[in-house]
Amino acid sequence: MKGKFIVFEGVDGSGKTTQIKLLGEKLESMGCPVVYTREPGGTRVGERIREILLNPLYGELVPWAEALLYAAARAQHVAQVILPALREGKVVLCDRFTDSSLAYQGYGRGVDIEMLEQVNRPAAAGVVPDLVLVLDFDREGQTERMARSGRSADRIEREAQEFYRRVRSGYLALAARAPRRYRVIDASRAEKLVHLDVLKAAEEVLDAFLKGNSRA
């Protein structure tokens, strides 16, 4: 694969969408071909699965059903979007990937981590991110802020603070397992400061790729 795969992870409200946009715009200004995508979603099938996963009407979803739906959306996403883009030499910026399943369904819901890894291995089809940016953020008070803004919380966002504390701890544990591939970034700071750290981490991974692209 000629492209690069950068994944943004973190609890809901950590600013992933904003930081993906900022990094993508910077890379595009440098002549880099960028693909923006997300999980669950990114494909027609994946977006329908996303509707089920995030709709509060389906609050009865049990943890394993939730985990398998995420894996199904991921398998479609990898085959239809991620792998083709990487083969074409593009930089794929993805909002969530396999670590979300481990953090949310594993650490958050208590689903066995090893079994989750076994399920997601074929779903990911051997694709491993070149860089995982974990935007570390304390979600305390986020539900109240959302209510004041007038936006209703989705099924996952309605979880209790203790759930999000477990998810956050899970992300930090995952990052500690492979520090060379992960960067934990304090997302509680100003947007511009977070972007500078994101850009620095991305440039370390993309250095040779960017040089090659500039010569093309």
From Swiss-Prot:
Catalytic activity: dTMP + ATP = dTDP + ADP
EC number(s) on file: 2.7.4.9
Entry GO MF terms: ATP binding; dTMP kinase activity
UniProt-recorded name of the protein: Thymidylate kinase
Keyword ATP-binding attributed: yes
GO CC annotation terms, alphabetical: cytosol
Family: Belongs to the thymidylate kinase family.
Highest classification ranks of the organism: Bacteria, Bacillati, Bacillota, Clostridia, Eubacteriales
